[in-house]
Amino acid sequence: TRDFANNIGAEIMGRNKFGPQRGPWADYDWQGWWGDEPPFHTPVFVLTHYERPSFTLSDTTFHFLDASPEDALERAFAAADGKDVRIGGGVATVKEFLDADLIDTMHVAVAPIELGRGERLWTSPDELTDRFHLERIPSASGMVHHLFWRK
């Protein structure tokens, strides 16, 4: 679980993870939650119905795609230089890739708190055990890491 960035050559995320705007882009000055030094250090492909020009912050270039999971993954792999592609979230994006059967391994950290309403990835992680092996690793903080890998 500590090896989060090893061998990652590109990331795919949904628009909700990128920022709070919905609908057409009203503010092209918004460049994400993370400031001038994004934590990705790879190309990032943001899935959105409203494309906008790509831009670069530090060593991360953000590309905005209105694409299927298959097409987005093809673009990300082409940019990943032989490395893996991480599906970074949010929930709707992860579900799309799971539904398209495009996930090989997955690490989901679950905190023991309820923040109110939101999207659920699952009711129980056991829902995925028809396709994936599952190992649960608890931590002293109460966080449980769910590690999935394809059967």
Name these PLM-found stretches.
Residues 1-151:
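Enzymes that bind and transform nitrogen-containing heteroaromatic metabolites
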